[in-house]
Amino acid sequence: GGVGKSALTIQLIQNHFVDEYDPTIEDSYRQQVVIDGETCLLDILDTAGQEEYSAMRDQYMRTGEGFLLVFAVNNAKSFEDISAYREQIKRVKDAEEVPMVLVGNKCDLPTRAVDMSQAREVARQYGIPFVETSAKTRMGVDDGFYTLVREIKKDKMKKGNSSRRGRSGRKQLKCSIL
């Protein structure tokens, strides 16, 4: 908890930074965006980082199509926890490859506990993109979410599935933030 998952989501949806920390249980957001010339409806599930809500994790991992694995650059433990989240997602989805993006948040802070070259190396080992973000300055926020959408689309093309299309013909994509 406290890595800035909600702040990233609110920055994407409402274009402002939430300073106070109010632990999330679960919040859901919808946002229509145009990515690579295509209109997509993002279904974003902002999840609980607190350990006491870990029982809910399997459920939202089952329904999510792609995942932002968020750690705070000033919190080494949050980075170390990423591996367990990734393994849990793969287990729940019963798949070796699931669309994910590693996100290093709070990049505006001068003090870092996580070396970005280390984060890039972990992302490379996992075969997933890495994006540096700051919910405070909005740096990389769109990039993080849009990169995940591209990963979901790539995965669907590989599997030969076309996205579910809503009544309006927009693609609907379910993203979860861990």
Curated annotation (Swiss-Prot):
Membrane topology: Lipid-anchor
Protein name: Ras-like protein
SUPFAM superfamilies for this protein: P-loop containing nucleoside triphosphate hydrolases (SSF52540)
Segment forming the signal sequence: none
Mechanisms controlling activity: Alternates between an inactive form bound to GDP and an active form bound to GTP. Activated by a guanine nucleotide-exchange factor (GEF) and inactivated by a GTPase-activating protein (GAP).
Keywords: Cell membrane, GTP-binding, Hydrolase, Lipoprotein, Membrane, Methylation, Nucleotide-binding, Prenylation
Residue positions of motif Effector region: 21-29
Species name: Artemia salina
Record's catalysed reaction(s): GTP + H2O = GDP + phosphate + H(+)
Pfam families: Ras
Family assignment from sequence similarity: Belongs to the small GTPase superfamily. Ras family.
Entry EC number(s): 3.6.5.2
Gene Ontology terms for molecular function: G protein activity; GTP binding
Role according to the record: Ras proteins bind GDP/GTP and possess intrinsic GTPase activity.
Subcellular localization: Cell membrane
One GO cellular component term: plasma membrane
Keyword Amino-acid biosynthesis recorded: no
Lipid moiety-binding residues (S-geranylgeranyl cysteine): C175
Propeptide: 176-178
Record-listed Cysteine methyl ester modification sites: C175
